[in-house]
Amino acid sequence: MANRIKNTPRDLPPLSRLEQRVMGIVWNLGECGSSEVIEEFNRTERLAESTIRTVLANLRKKGYVELVPTIARQHRFRPAVSRENVGKRTLRDLVSGFFGGSPRQVLSCLIKEERLSDEDLEALRKLIEEQQGKGK
């Protein structure tokens, strides 16, 4: 089966926190039924099955998931957009909305507020060095 994941979520409406959590489960599972999403969600937090089914229906309406053709009566879902591209768009929205468009402010906040390991800091240094030559 061909990869049907769309490359860009630019025209899709933003996700609520609950939709983000459910979408994370769908991305992790790949193709899945609502019962699998419910089971996975309830490992960390209890939520009514009907609520999760409603969230899945809303994600479908928004274009984040699509139905998988099946002969069974149960709906099966798969991601319609990639996690990476939704993450990039979400980060761009965060940078422009909360940090005045400044990546420097985002990185400053991240470094000051999070406990970054030496390994994480070294990886950030390498990324910065790579970008310095590109003029970005």
List the model feature ranges, each with a label.
Residues R53-A57:
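Short, hydrophobic-biased segments on the C-terminal half of alpha helices
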Residues V86-K134:
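Amphipathic alpha-helical dimerization/coiled-coil segments
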Residues G63:
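Glycine-centered, phosphate/nucleic-acid-interacting loop/turn motifs that mediate DNA/RNA or nucleotide
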Residues I25-G33:
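Short capping segments at the starts of secondary-structure elements
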Residues P14-L18, T70-R89:
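Short, cationic-aromatic polyanion-contact patches
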Residues E39-E49:
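Short helix-coil junctions and helix-kink-helix linkers
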Residues M1-M23, K134:
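Short alpha-helical segments that sit at the start of domains
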